[in-house]
Design a protein with these regions (language model features):
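Short, Lys/Arg-enriched N-terminal segments with co-localized hydrophobic residues
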Residues: 25-43
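An N-terminal-biased, well-structured beta-alpha scaffold segment characteristic
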Residues: 44-138, 258
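Structural alpha-helical scaffold elements that stabilize or flank donor/cofactor-binding regions
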Residues: 84-85, 235-236, 261, 325-326
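Short glycine-/small-residue-rich Rossmann-like dinucleotide-binding loops
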Residues: 96-97, 241, 247-249, 275-276, ...
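Phosphate-binding beta-alpha-beta segment of Rossmann-like dinucleotide-binding domains, i.e.
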Residues: 134-190, 194, 202-205
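Rossmann-like dinucleotide-binding domain for NAD(H)/NADP(H)
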Residues: 268, 277-371
Length: 371
């Protein structure tokens, strides 16, 4: 049997004990970057945590194209009590709300996990220092559908502004009065985009389509963007009618929206966040809402969301939380971290995640490696 050994194959110990052949499970494997399986052999096992029906649907469509990969889907999310379920798996796959702190990483290391596949763009919930220390690699799915998130940001802005969600309910109850449905024009108003990565750029283009003037703030301005004007953060806050957050969660951006920055905003501003909940200091936002600073607020992400997001809590009594306080305000519109949730995005997530796994498996270059 010919054996083509790929460079830096992370599964060397497992796959080159051929003289023993205690099990025909690996018999006939030929290794190369383009031909990494033969005779239906399983090369890599992945445990998917926090799996929803839509996750399975999109991954199972693509799995036949990756016959060297075996996966198991479980509903439980990963945390200290469930990390040990990864015993016997080469990799785990997790989502944005997973607990991947130091204790969990240490347990994954004890169970022999070599790779963490994040089926999302963000990884601020992963303890990268510990994964590096334990030799566990982390891959993600960058930019799987910037347009999906940007479109949802504008949908939130429009819904919060024009009260379409309330109008729908009123009409279903045969109430066609217009009381409480007054909005404002976006045309010829100023949109302030904080963060001009792919999503921020997509949002800027959408705002331009509404006839808005688009200004932006970013720590690293992109001089090639001719459809917006970069300004200082203070100028953006003080002149924008619509502010949309599209920056990553970093120590520099945590609680970027706080009492000080809110005070600099125009009265009657509309604020939208589809990026990370920690960008906004929620207590300060609530104080601003009570002071009538905001015409409307649209939130797809929020602090404390990890305990509730993606779960059906409709039959539960939630403990006192900032989420409940936000929901009590008539000018706040909230959705359940669904900005990414389109057919195109889920297809891209599944494909990129499996490609990340394949690249790791055969020792190819990993384009989406965090470290």
């Amino acid at each position: 049997m010919d054996i083509i050994i790929p460079k830096q194959n992370p599964f060397f110990d497992k796959f080159y004990r051929f003289p023993h052949f205690p099990n025909s499970y690996y018999y006939g494997i030929i290794f190369s970057e383009n031909n990494y399986f033969q005779r239906g052999a399983t090369i890599m096992k992945i445990l998917f945590y926090d799996t929803k029906s839509y996750d399975k649907e999109f991954f199972e469509k693509l799995l036949p194209s990756y016959p060297g990969i075996e996966v198991k889907f479980i509903e439980a999310n990963i945390h200290e009590e469930t990390a040990a379920l990864a015993h016997g798996y080469d990799a785990i796959c997790a989502f944005v709300n997973a607990d991947l702190g130091t204790p969990v990483i240490e347990e994954l290391h004890r169970q022999g996990v070599k790779l963490i596949l994040m089926r999302c763009a963000g990884y601020n919930n992963v303890d990268l220092e510990t994964t590096a220390k334990r030799g566990i690699q982390v891959a993600r799915v960058p930019g799987y559908s910037p347009e999906a998130v940007a479109e949802h940001a504008m949908a939130l802005a429009l819904t919060a502004n024009r009260h379409t969600h309330k109008a729908y309910i009123k009409c279903r109850e045969n109430n066609f009065a217009l009381n409480g449905l007054m909005g404002v024009n976006f045309y010829q108003k100023t949109a302030g985009i904080i963060g001009t990565g792919k999503i921020g750029q997509a949002m800027a283009k959408i705002c331009r389509g509404f006839g808005m003037k688009v200004i932006a703030y970013d720590l690293f301005p992109n001089k090639n963007l001719d459809f917006l004007e970069y300004v200082s953060l203070d100028e953006l806050l003080s002149t924008s009618d619509l502010i949309s957050l599209h920056c990553p969660m970093t120590p520099e951006t945590e609680h970027l929206i706080n009492s000080e920055t809110i005070a600099k905003m125009k009265d009657g501003v509309i604020l939208v966040n589809t990026s990370r909940g920690g960008l906004i200091k929620t207590d300060d936002l609530i104080a601003g809402i009570r002071d009538h600073k905001f015409f409307a607020v649209g939130l797809d992400v929020y602090e404390e969301e990890s305990a509730y997001v993606y779960e059906d809590m409709s039959s539960s009594i939630l403990p006192t939380s900032t989420i409940q306080r936000l929901l009590s305000f008539p000018n706040v519109t909230m959705t359940s971290h669904q900005g990414f949730f389109t057919v195109e995005a889920l297809t891209n997530i599944a494909e990129t995640t499996l490609e990340n796994a394949k690249a790791f498996m055969v020792g190819a270059e990993m384009k989406n490696l965090v470290h």
